[in-house]
Amino acid sequence: MGGRNFRYIALDFETTGLDLQTDEPIQIWIMEFDLNGKVLWGFQSLLRPVKKATELKSIVCFITKLSIQQLESAPRPEEIIEEIQWFFWEDTIIVGHNISFDLHFLEKFFPWLKRKTTLD
């Protein structure tokens, strides 16, 4: 990669379901790490869905172990932009399991994000 210093972050979302058209992120995890796998920095936040949290499928609460009350008091995605934007610099490589799923939600709910290099 040409001697450039790249940043590596792991990204993971919990969502209300698997459909990008109708579902929303309800939790985000971001971890920056070095080439040796040492975690340098991390961020985690619950996210309040646009839909009323009371409309969530009970299976979502069961799988994620998140309560409706936790989600109703969480920030909306646009309220955490300042806290997460520094993770996504031009030299950032995003890694994760099934990362395309997370990237689709990231790009929909954080549209300012430009496509970065990814590793799945």
Residue ranges and their predicted role:
Residues 1-116:
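Conserved non-catalytic scaffold segment of RNase H-like nuclease domains
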Residues 119-120:
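Short, flexible loop segments at boundaries between secondary-structure elements
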